[in-house]
Amino acid sequence: MVNLLIETHNLSKTETLTIHTASFMKTITHLLALLAAAVCLSFAAETWACTSAVISGKVTPDGRPLLWNIRDTDFRLNHMAYVKGQRYDFVANVNSANFPALKEAWMGSNSAGFALMNTQSYNLVEVKPGEERGEANGRIIYRALELCATVQEFCHFLDTLQKPSYIEANFGVIDAQGGAAMFEVDYYGYTMYDANNPKDAPYGYIARTNFSFAGKVNQGSGYVRYMEADGTLMQASAMSQITPLWMVNRLSRSFCNRLLQVDLRDGCHNQPEASGWFVDQDFIPRNSTSCSIIVQGVKPGENPALTTLWTLLGYPPTGLLVPLWVSDNMPPMVAYDARFKAAPLSHQSISMADRQVFAYHQGMGTGKYLHWEALWNRQGNGLMQQLQPLEAELYRQSEATLTRWRQSGKPDQKEMKQLYEAIEAKIQESLLRW
């Protein structure tokens, strides 16, 4: 532990300088993007409107912790990258436009079974003119994934960063020892919430959007999305329903707005009763969503290599959930492809969403209109309805392979490659029919 503290402290000094230098052009880009968004939209919009949760193994059916995030960003085209880290290798979600030039990651898991994600918080720090809000968040995830093995080591990592750290985020963490926690982090400190402690998590989970409980009251953003995530998880945790497939279907593809008391799947917003269009406001998946990932951890004593990243690149209602493990055996479907300047699955999902879901482009501010009829309809041939049976089949096949590996105690690299190839073949066959 002493070596980790010293090493992390020394690295953090140069790390902060690197963040300032590397982020200069990125800061300008983000400022221009925010200005454009403010001009184009006639109503309030959220930037980086992520939704997340950390789930204790105490309330999952198999006793394994879960880490869920749905990521919203200006960088919608993503891929998954395998990185040989300083201490631990890891697989993480990255921006295809600027990785590896910028050593930033947004959610991932490493060879020790340590997994980390973040949501941008907007009520922890008074950002000064010229500062980029949370400019260090992605860099910190990258560094922590290559240095940390446990929740406790992540605490020490945060403790030893040079201050101000330029972090403003809610970080969700799980590890191979059963650890599961949420950290609300600002420039000078953090508040930790333990998902295994009933005082912090009476229902066995902790959800966050874009505000922090330790921050200023009723400031930040994402309160309506929080209502939906928290309410859905609360009921499911009492019935041991929370699995990766359940999370992607009930959360990453939720079209409920609890403030409006709207659930688009009730059919009332479909033809012929309605137009089949709705405004994309405060649903968990959004037109700015780039991916949703659920990391399924291991039980204490299990091989950390069995930690599984259930990965959906792109807009969740038009994407497919596939499994990944920390290995250099990265399947082409989620890796960077120069033809698309992103992963094929990311490009496919985003393109489908732009063409058929957010398809109305007539003047400024129209990108918020959601063609719900194209996603889900009473005839049962909406995009989401057609993709989900294929996804369920891929999930069952992957679960069967994972069960064998858990029984043998480790992943089989040959089987892993065969599984990836089988999944890719089924996806390609299905998409060709569309």
Regions found by a protein language model. Give the residues of each.
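Bacterial N-terminal signal peptides that target proteins for export
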Residues: 20-33
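Bacterial N-terminal signal peptides
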Residues: 33-43
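Sec/Tat signal peptide C-region and signal peptidase I cleavage site
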Residues: 43-49
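C-terminal, well-structured catalytic/ligand-binding subdomain of enzymes
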Residues: 51-102, 107-108, 118-142, 175-434
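Proteins synthesized as precursors that undergo proteolytic processing into mature forms
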Residues: 128-172, 177
